[in-house]
Amino acid sequence: MTYNQPNNKGFYGQFGGQFVPETLMTAVKQLEEAYVDSKKDPLFQAELKELLKDYVGRENPLYYAKRLTEYAGGAKIYLKREDLNHTGAHKINNALGQVLLAKKMGKNKVIAETGAGQHGVASATAAALFGMECTIYMGEEDVKRQSLNVFRMELLGAKVHSVTDGSRVLKDAVNAALRAWVAQVEDTHYVMGSVLGPHPFPQIVRDYQAVIGQEARAQFLEKENKLPDALVACVGGGSNSMGLFYPFVNDESVAMYGVEAAGLGIDTPHHAATITKGRPGVLHGTLMDVLQDENGQMLEAFSISAGLDYPGIGPEHSYFNAVGRAKYVDITDEEALEGFKILSRTEGIIPALESSHAIAYAVKLAKELGADKSMIVCLSGRGDKDVVQVKERLEAEKEVKK
Amino acid sequence: MKTLQMTLSNKKNNFIPYIMAGDHEKGLEGLKETIQLLEQAGSSAIEIGVPFSDPVADGPVIEQAGLRALARNVSLSSILETLKTIDTKVPLVIMTYFNPVYQFGIEKFVAALEKTPVKGLIIPDLPKEHEDYIKPFINDKDICLVPLVSLTTPLSRQKELVADAEGFIYAVAINGVTGKENAYSNQLDQHLKALSSLTDVPVLTGFGISTLSDVDRFNKVSSGVIVGSKIVRDLHEGKENEVIKFIENAINF
């Protein structure tokens, strides 16, 4: 049966929905209408396609990582090179689409949340391109951890609002952005950065990121004349993974692996393994798996990678997990760091710490699958933003050893 | 007609204070005396807030109160246990985000409410589209699910929201979070009057109300007011007398 989610109420099985205050209902309904219209509007689609080609630099390569494959000693590993996009990650695919939508709706201001800063940079970039006013909400902790991205956003003309509520990370930035949206909903669009939030956001972000899987599928067919056996991508909120997975959803022979951040380990309190350790709950407008205590209070997520540091996961991922369409696995901080180093050394590609989780799992999976199999790994972003953090960590480890 | 609506329909200048359960130096032990104080001052009903880690509809005053309550290990389940022991003539209204209720179990929640003086529910992140999570369980009980109507709600939707409303209609007076002051639009009074004319269910106005002149203004164009952040702040600062005086003045306009 052809996959056909979400339903007309914005649910993926039991997950999804629109759990937002009444003040936002008109805005999410307006967004839904504008989005449906835009899909039928050839001019809109042509403008987006042209931007993706000439501005983002798509299509980006599907690269056969020969030396990484040899290192892993098993299945062939192909990398979908989202790291080569303008701004260095997959986030721009969605930011451009949503800023175009905002323009279509006559909204001249955009706001967005950001964790590591990649979605903030992508949104600020898209806003600069269209001359729109842009405010980015970022947890105070992340502002400190990612000061270079803060400077980038400011260079691009955005205002960065440091969020001092709660644990001062991504979850709190989303709270602040939602509150700001309520206060200026009539002239402002909220550029949701992942497949999260009230319907239609999870669908819109999935569809704008689906270009990843559409290209990768066609490229793989051309190179190998068959479909891959597996797809691997990291999952925080889950936008790069859903972008890769979704175009393969009806290809039953293709297995999907979403790699969650296990932080210090899933048996410690310090992880972001939402599917493994969470259960269904409502946060930020949607029903999805979340990390929460027995009373339904959200727990803090933890990961070396700021982009995976979120206690929820997109509702469609919860659905994929519930029906068994995708498998969700965990990679610790240590393993991710190893992946970061391995890809740098074997292929000369420095991956983002987020994507390093996918690399680390791909190496394990390649061995399990064996040499006659193949997989596509989403290399969702480049690692320049993480180099300083990794350097400090490795130096600290050396100190301890001395 | 359910108790909550009957109580509010019978008078003008209704005053509903909001308090955060467990935000008291004695924790939930202090809830009873706060309810008594608000009842004696002349409240029509009392809104009891359930703390939540991510209260996106609330401003900083209520968010902080919630964090203080959570730090005292207050939970929906301990609040329900406490409410069972409280005897009050004014109807209580629980204000909670949806997730604590969803985790507790909706049927179990409604069953527990029946042993308390709670007569209404306000769930700001459960819009009309999702009321079926709760409504079927309370239809034949003396509990109302109070709808919120915002300034961004178009007229056609306002009509849908009030059509089967019970208890009262919560008119959100600003586009913003609770406790945001001095932001009322000039068209607000007209909006409230028009909204009230759509229904026989009492319309009460809330969000950002902190002065007696606000109260006077909204009593003229609706059936009363809901005051949260001001009450929560005053109680936290130990200004019980100020709260009593404010309520007494508010209901005597």
Swiss-Prot record, chain A:
Pfam families: PALP. GO terms for cellular component: cytoplasm. Pathway: Amino-acid biosynthesis; L-tryptophan biosynthesis; L-tryptophan from chorismate: step 5/5. Keywords: Amino-acid biosynthesis, Aromatic amino acid biosynthesis, Lyase, Pyridoxal phosphate, Tryptophan biosynthesis. Its cofactor is pyridoxal 5'-phosphate. Its EC number is 4.2.1.20. Belongs to the TrpB family. This is Tryptophan synthase beta chain. It comes from Lactococcus lactis subsp. lactis (strain IL1403) (Streptococcus lactis). The gene is trpB.
Curated annotation (Swiss-Prot), chain B:
It comes from the Bacteria. Coiled coil: none annotated. Pathway: Amino-acid biosynthesis; L-tryptophan biosynthesis; L-tryptophan from chorismate: step 5/5. One of its GO terms (cellular component) is cytosol. NCBIfam families: trpA. Tetramer of two alpha and two beta chains. The alpha subunit is responsible for the aldol cleavage of indoleglycerol phosphate to indole and glyceraldehyde 3-phosphate. This is Tryptophan synthase alpha chain.
